[in-house]
Regions:
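N-terminal "arm"/small-domain region of PLP-dependent enzymes with the aminotransferase-like
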Residues: 1-67
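Conserved PLP-enzyme active-site core in the AAT-like
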Residues: 5-16, 20, 40-43, 64, ...
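Conserved C-terminal alpha-helix-loop-beta "cap" of PLP-dependent enzymes
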Residues: 294-469
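Structural signal for conserved beta-strand scaffold positions within catalytic alpha/beta enzyme cores
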Residues: 87, 133-135, 224, 354, ...
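Charge-dense polyanion-binding interfaces
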Residues: 466-486
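Short glycine-rich or small-residue beta-strand-to-loop segments that form or flank ligand, phosphate
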Residues: 59, 86-88, 166-169, 327, ...
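Conserved N-terminal alpha-helix of the aminotransferase class I/II PLP-enzyme fold
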Residues: 49-94
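Short, glycine-/Ser/Thr-/acidic-enriched flexible segments
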Residues: 33, 173, 228-229, 244-246, ...
Length: 486
């Protein structure tokens, strides 16, 4: 086998060679290097459209890689400290779902926090696994769910020793980290696999100034969003696995749902970004840390806002904090996060990652500059001056843990009927309701609808949150499980 090193980018290099050749395309895609769609060329550029190609012998095949894609995956595994890696072109949604489908079958139990991304619960709908939700602590001031607590996980393991796996969000969207190494050791001692949704942690492995990464903590699988903080194109992702997993079986699971027409634009972007991180990741992310800490200090100096950080660490529900996450509590100026989000975009042409009931998140990454930070800080100061109010009518909590009545799969495939939000109180939900982003369900199939949850949904609607998941696009009605007593 030829020797590989991190200076190489096999897919990128193959694409460069392809561009130099004068191959006449009688294969798909039908735009034929852009000639059949000049408007697309005008939008994306000739160089981009010219390498939007399908699988061919010189370019390998993602479903069964034997050459350049295999080499690219080996380089990813080496760069991230994994036993094996997979290039994923269905976003980290596909990576998360592959983790669960690889470890759980119908009727199997999986231990996880309730504040998971919808992709995890969707995987439960697909495979029929039974969720064992861990109760989450909520920060009383900023209203966000915190990390998994070791004692609560230990109790769940003791109560459900037959569970197959534990899923951990690390870090959360807000930057909260659990005791990943301790939880991994605890789960392994009980014979359970450890799956980590590391969508927001592609950068963790590359500097010791950040929390421990999933692979470094000994996890069995990790879903990594390279496009979020690693520099690759949107929808590209990585799935990392440890030595305990069978890579051939995992590949079979991936191929159940993965496109057979994989995008070489996405794969090349993963290849290039991996090389960049392997060669310059430490330097790049330490610069990101400096920018984030500077922004945090400047925002807190405005007054009213609270850009939180490592002071949240209590070694119980918060064991570390990803300081690259610029999470800011906004209710101190009387505005919800979504209101600040909308003002930044509509009045200041600044697009942040998301706003929710109490917080905003500005994603700081390898592409940011000091002048961008200054513009954000200035806009936040201006918003406080022009738009702040008393905020007496705001809802404090960001997270409500629902009661699970039916498994997600049973509920999703049950006969349903549509009720108004108020009529649905007390019923069992038959669909998802969530603010997106971040895509964490307020309600999932199989959960009891309460007055508190309905009030939260109505408040989120009033304040401009983008609600998704329901058949009713206006979210005035919700599908509930149809039963005789209903």
């Amino acid at each position: 086998m030829k020797e590989l090193d991190q200076n190489q980018a096999p897919i990128y290099e193959a694409m460069v060679k392809l561009r130099k050749k004068r191959i006449v395309p009688f294969d798909v895609p039908g735009h034929k290097r852009g000639r059949g769609n000049p408007e697309l060329v005008e939008l994306l550029g000739e160089k981009c459209v010219g390498i939007d190609v399908n699988s061919m012998k010189p370019l390998d095949n993602l479903g069964h890689p034997i050459s350049i894609i295999r080499d690219a995956e080996e380089l990813v595994a080496d760069a991230f400290g994994a036993s094996h890696a997979f290039l994923m072109i269905g976003g980290t949604t596909s990576s998360v779902q592959t983790m669960i489908l690889s470890t759980c079958k119908a009727g199997d139990k999986i231990i996880l926090p309730r504040n998971v991304h919808k992709s995890a619960i969707n995987a439960l709908v697909l495979c029929g696994a039974i969720p064992i939700y861990i109760e989450m602590s909520v920060d009383p001031k900023i209203g966000i769910a915190l990390g998994l607590e070791n004692d609560r996980v230990a109790k769940a393991i003791k109560k459900h020793p037959d569970a197959k796996a534990i899923l951990i969000n690390n870090p959360t969207y807000y930057g909260i980290c659990s005791d990943l190494k301790g939880l991994t050791e605890m789960a392994h001692e009980a014979g359970m696999m450890v799956l980590v949704d590391e969508a927001h942690g592609a950068h963790l492995h590359f500097t010791d100034k950040l929390p421990i990464s999933a692979m470094d903590a000994g996890a069995d699988m990790a879903a990594v969003s390279m496009h979020k903080s690693g520099g690759s194109l949107t929808q590209s992702s990585l799935l990392l696995i440890g030595k305990q997993m069978n890579p051939e079986y995992v590949r079979q699971i991936i191929n159940l749902t993965q496109s057979t027409s994989a995008s070489y634009l996405l794969m090349a972007s993963l290849d290039i970004s991996r090389r960049n991180l392997a060669l310059r990741g430490k330097e790049s992310f330490e610069k990101v840390i400096e920018l984030s800490e500077y922004a945090r200090r400047e925002i807190n100096a405005i007054g009213g806002y609270y850009a939180y950080s490592k002071e949240l660490i209590d070694s119980v529900s918060v064991c570390d904090f990803d300081v690259t996450k610029l999470s800011v509590y906004t209710q101190g100026i009387g505005l919800t996060g979504i209101e600040v989000y909308d003002l930044l975009r509509d009045e200041y042409d600044i697009q942040i990652e998301f706003g929710d009931i109490g917080n905003i998140l500005a994603y700081i990454s390898i592409g940011d500059r000091i002048q961008d930070i200054e513009r954000l800080v200035g806009a936040l100061a201006d918003i406080k001056r022009l738009y702040s109010r008393d905020g007496k009518d705001l809802i404090a909590g960001e997270y409500i843990q629902p009661e699970l009545v039916l498994s997600p799969q049973e509920a999703f495939y049950s006969e349903r009927k549509s009720l108004t939000l108020d009529e649905s109180i007390g019923q069992v939900c038959g669909e998802f309701v969530m603010c997106y982003p971040p895509g964490i369900p307020i309600l999932a199939p199989g959960e009891r609808i309460t007055r508190e949850i309905v009030d939260y949904i109505q408040f989120a609607k009033e304040r401009g949150c983008s609600l998704q998941g329901t058949e009713d696009p206006e979210v005035n009605h919700i599908n509930v499980i149809k039963r005789k007593e209903n």
